[in-house]
Amino acid sequence: MKISKKRRQELIRKIIHEKKISNQFQIVEELKKYGIKAVQPTVARDLKEIGAVKIMDESGNYVYKLLDETPVIDPWKELKRNFKSFVESIDRAGNLIVIKTIPGTASGIARVIDRLDIDEIVGTLAGDDTIFVAVRDPESCEKIVEKLSSIL
């Protein structure tokens, strides 16, 4: 069935709110139950537009949540849990921190690092299994590496 983008996004919001959705293909399948044919790239764009993000739930699984429904969790507590579960190594190169994670978890961990609101951290960039953390200067970088390494 052909529906408007607005209606499809409303359904995606409903699906995310009612079910634990861990990947975009699950949303494609759920939309089929409503008689709506959608492909993964369309769902990916919709998720971005409606502000859906993947966060770790209470069971340690990553699921989609809407930003306005995301519970406020102490970022240091969340980082500690994420680091112990998903970080493989931390290294330093000049004023960059390179964090290697298990595949598929880097963006979630980078988002938590951004929420730490550390003045010395300029920003993060995440791929599938690698995070670059840009730090203002090498001295601050060393202190942050020590603090992050102590969490592992």
From Swiss-Prot:
- Which GO terms label this protein's molecular function in UniProt? arginine binding; cis-regulatory region sequence-specific DNA binding; DNA-binding transcription factor activity
Q: In which pathway does it act?
A: Amino-acid biosynthesis; L-arginine biosynthesis [regulation]
Top-level taxon of the source organism: Bacteria
> What gene name is listed for this protein?
argR
Q: Which SUPFAM superfamilies match?
A: C-terminal domain of arginine repressor, Winged helix' DNA-binding domain
- Alphabetical list of HAMAP family matching this protein: Arg_repressor
**What function does the entry list?**
Regulates arginine biosynthesis genes.
What lineage, starting at the top, does this entry show?
Answer: Bacteria, Thermotogati, Thermotogota, Thermotogae, Thermotogales
Return the Pfam families for the record: Arg_repressor, Arg_repressor_C
* Annotated source species: Thermotoga maritima (strain ATCC 43589 / DSM 3109 / JCM 10099 / NBRC 100826 / MSB8)
Tell me where it resides. Cytoplasm
Protein family per UniProt: Belongs to the ArgR family.
Supply the alphabetized keyword list.
Amino-acid biosynthesis, Arginine biosynthesis, Cytoplasm, DNA-binding, Repressor, Transcription, Transcription regulation
Kindly give the InterPro entries that the UniProt entry links to this protein.
Arg_repress, Arg_repress_C, Arg_repress_C_sf, Arg_repress_DNA-bd, WH-like_DNA-bd_sf, WH_DNA-bd_sf
Cite a single GO BP annotation.
regulation of arginine metabolic process
A cellular-component GO term for this protein: transcription regulator complex
The molecule here is called Arginine repressor
